Each structure stands twice: as C-alpha cells, then as structure tokens.
C-alpha cells in the first residue's frame, strides 16, 4: 500500500484479541517486542506454553509483522538484574555481557553474536530489524556501532526489508541531531526507520516538538527511507501528514516511549483506556458521552465507550487506521480536520501543519 500505514504495537498477551478480530482488520501491519517472543522461564505462570502465539495469531490473520529487537534497554547499568525473567530469557539478552555499550560491541565477534541472536525471533517475519543502541549525536560512538549492526543484519536479511531503529531523547530531537542520524542509517542500507523518542510526551507535543519530528521525517524520506513514528499515540496521524510513512501505537498502551531506558514495568504501561474521538485527536473516558460517531462501518463502539473495554480497543484501532490514511491522502491539509478540536494542544498541531504548508508554498 502507499503511505498511511498504521502499525499495531502488540501487547504481550493479546493473541486471542488479534485472532478474534473481524475483517477488514483495523491495522495494516504489526510490531512485536522481542521480549514478547522469548521462552517462558520456569516458575512463570505460562511456563511450557508456546512462546510465539502473537506471531501465530498475526500469521492466521495474514498480517505482516516485524520484531523490535528492543536492545537499547540493555544499555542501562544493572540491566541484567532489572530484567523480568522472561525478558532475560531472550537470545539478545544472553548474546554478550550486559550492559550493552559501544565498548562491548567494539569487536566484530560481538556484533555478529548480537545480530545472530536477534535473528532467532525473526525467522517468520517478512522484514529484518537490526539490533540498536540509543544514539545522541552524529559523533556518538554508538552510531558507528548501529551502522555495523545494520551492515551485519543486511547480510542475514536476504530479500527481506531491512529495518533500523533510531532511538533518541527529546533533547536530541530538538537540537537537530536526529535528521543526520536518519541519513546515515539510510546510507547504510536501511529501508525502513522506526523513530523512537524518549523523554517525550507525544500526545501533549508542542509545536516546536512537532516541527523537530517533522524535520527528522523529512531527512529520512529525502534519503529514500520509509519513516515510521513509533509509540506516538494520537500524534501519529499528524506526523503522517508531515510525510511519515506510518505510525505505531496500541489501542491502550505504547502511546509513548518510556522515559526510563529500562522501565521496571516493561514500558507498555498506560493509564485509563479512552475512546478516540474521530477527527479530534482526543480521548473520552468510559463514562463520557459524545455526539460524534465512529466513521468505520461495523464498529462495536460507534457512539462512545459505553464502558465496554474490548469494543473501545477495537474502535481505537479503527480510528487510528482511518486517521493514518486520511492524513496520508490529505497531507498538510489534514490541519483542517484538527482546527476545531476542543483540545488546545490539537489546535496547536493544526497550526503547525498550516505553518509547514506556508513554508512549502
């Protein structure tokens, strides 16, 4: 398909939810954290059960999925002890001594070991994602490591699309470093780049932050790469309007990248499940009512949350997919849909899109 892809960021145990979804599916592709494909360890409530049920559920629905190697979290001091037992069981967590660092990945043997470990959970995927470290600037030695990880991944990917992850902090989003990093990843052979910004609140993004994110998207797109905004919640459609190929989030969780490099709770935590209001980029609480209906035929929660958790999750995916496609089709003119939102934050996004349109004129 053309631009406007919506990627489901899978929760750890939602295989039944995925299998039971009716067609047409409310997402275009999916991303599974490598942690959610690890063997269940002894003592775990699911010990002995299949480790790959998320992948199997997606395969049963004919969905293209890829893996987030989720290796940046392994950089934090003490990460070996902070991991949950299942996460500690994954091959990338055992490939070389932790914590990961540019120094520990200086030798080619370590590069090979980490990439080959990451490949074990990607055998059924039609894309191949390279392991990665968080990067600060173009001079960061971790960027050189990421380029080497990408080169080795290219050798194992075969004819599969090669995915790079660009994880930065908000500081380096705003200082302009990330655009150059995206260009370097593209030059090393990445075909898709998932952008992850830590210490950033996407659903409360300021105009300055949206402009900075748009600049990263433009840099990668200009270099010939499909840019995907990862874990951005309802900001995703705005970023698609600026030129992103798509965005990834979940109906409830994975609405931002955890501020902690290695969060104790796993990084997918969320607050209250809200009902996404069409064309308003805001959410309603379970007890709220709305005069705006879901625009997708067959939605199980067309008139608001109604206290139905499952139906609200499905509706939210419908709305994210619809918004992604509209934003891709309308481009910067997508601002008109957001300009009358009750949210001042969202109206600020509309003004930012209008500003970009004036620049492009």
Describe the role of every protein-language-model region.
Residues 216-220:
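Long, low-complexity, intrinsically disordered terminal regions
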Residues 254-317:
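C-terminal structured domains
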Residues 4, 298-361:
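C-terminal extensions of enzymes
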Residues 213, 223-237:
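Glycine-rich adenosine-cofactor-binding loop
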Residues 58, 221, 240:
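Anion (oxyanion) recognition and catalysis
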Residues 2-183, 190-193, 197-202:
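Active-site beta->alpha loop and helix N-cap motifs at the rims of alpha/beta catalytic domains
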Residues 29-38, 127-132, 232-264:
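Glycine-rich phosphate-binding active-site loops on the catalytic face of alpha/beta enzymes
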Residues 178-215, 242, 256-272:
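Glycine/Thr-rich beta-alpha phosphate-binding loop at enzyme active sites
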């Amino acid at each position: 398909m053309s631009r406007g892809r919506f990627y489901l960021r899978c929760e750890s145990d939602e295989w039944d939810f995925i299998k039971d979804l009716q067609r047409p599916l409310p997402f275009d592709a999916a991303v599974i954290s490598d942690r959610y494909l690890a063997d269940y360890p002894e003592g775990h409530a699911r010990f002995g059960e299949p480790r790959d049920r998320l992948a199997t559920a997606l395969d049963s629905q004919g969905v293209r999925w890829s893996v987030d190697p989720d290796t940046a979290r392994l950089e934090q001091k003490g990460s070996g002890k902070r991991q949950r037992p299942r996460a500690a069981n994954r091959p990338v967590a055992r490939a070389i001594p932790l914590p990961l660092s540019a120094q520990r990945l200086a030798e080619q043997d370590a590069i090979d070991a980490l990439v080959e470990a990451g490949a074990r959970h990607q055998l059924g995927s039609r894309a191949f994602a390279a392991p990665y470290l968080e990067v600060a600037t173009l001079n960061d030695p971790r960027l050189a490591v990421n380029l080497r990880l990408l080169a080795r991944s290219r050798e194992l990917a075969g004819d599969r699309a090669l995915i790079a992850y660009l994880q930065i902090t908000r500081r380096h989003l705003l200082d302009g470093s990330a655009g150059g990093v995206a260009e370097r990843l593209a030059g090393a052979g990445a075909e898709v780049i998932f952008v992850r910004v830590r210490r950033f609140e996407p659903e409360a993004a300021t105009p300055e932050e949206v402009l900075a994110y748009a600049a990263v998207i433009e840099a990668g797109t200009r270099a010939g790469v499909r840019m995907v905004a990862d874990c951005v919640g309802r900001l995703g459609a705005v970023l698609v309007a600026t030129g992103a190929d798509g965005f990834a989030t979940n109906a409830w969780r994975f609405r931002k990248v955890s501020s902690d490099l290695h969060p104790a709770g796993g990084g997918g935590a969320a607050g209250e499940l809200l009902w996404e209001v069409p064309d308003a980029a805001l959410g309603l609480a379970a007890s709220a009512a709305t005069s705006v209906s879901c625009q997708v035929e067959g939605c199980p929660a067309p008139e608001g949350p109604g206290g139905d958790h499952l139906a609200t999750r499905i509706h939210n995916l419908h709305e994210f997919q619809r918004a992604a496609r509209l934003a891709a089709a309308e481009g910067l003119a997508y601002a008109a849909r957001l300009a009358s939102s009750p949210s001042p934050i969202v109206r600020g996004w509309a003004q930012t899109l209008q500003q970009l349109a004036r620049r492009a004129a």
